[in-house]
Curated annotation (Swiss-Prot):
GO terms for molecular function: large ribosomal subunit rRNA binding; structural constituent of ribosome. The gene is rplN. PANTHER family: 50S/60S RIBOSOMAL PROTEIN L14/L23, LARGE RIBOSOMAL SUBUNIT PROTEIN UL14M. The lineage of its organism: Bacteria, Thermotogati, Deinococcota, Deinococci, Deinococcales. The keyword Ribosomal protein applies. Forms part of two intersubunit bridges in the 70S ribosome. Binds to 23S rRNA. It comes from Deinococcus radiodurans (strain ATCC 13939 / DSM 20539 / JCM 16871 / CCUG 27074 / LMG 4051 / NBRC 15346 / NCIMB 9279 / VKM B-1422 / R1). Belongs to the universal ribosomal protein uL14 family. Keywords: Ribonucleoprotein, Ribosomal protein, RNA-binding, rRNA-binding. This is Large ribosomal subunit protein uL14.
Amino acid sequence: MIMPQSRLDVADNSGAREIMCIRVLNSGIGGKGLTTGGGGNKRYAHVGDIIVASVKDAAPRGAVKAGDVVKAVVVRTSHAIKRADGSTIRFDRNAAVIINNQGEPRGTRVFGPVARELRDRRFMKIVSLAPEVL
């Protein structure tokens, strides 16, 4: 579960290494790109949710710099995810992929496995870039 002030690893090559959640959005990808549903008042973010975050640590010559405010989609959480078939999956660390306003990743690569729930949330570009979908 990701909440404001939570720190996440960045699982892409956009230049950011670590981000801190500022706000959790009620959101997903709609027919015309990214829809936030008015922001909402959601307390926690899970896999597939979009957050607003501040870049805390970045590579020297990356596309994003430390201090930038970005949108990101959560791809891994250390809190267990319960699935419809009764199984659960849990990752070692929390991680996110930085996205633009259309819901597409800003980087060209995704590192590490991502959860299958991203496919249900229509983040197909992230799923296709990931080396493994669990």
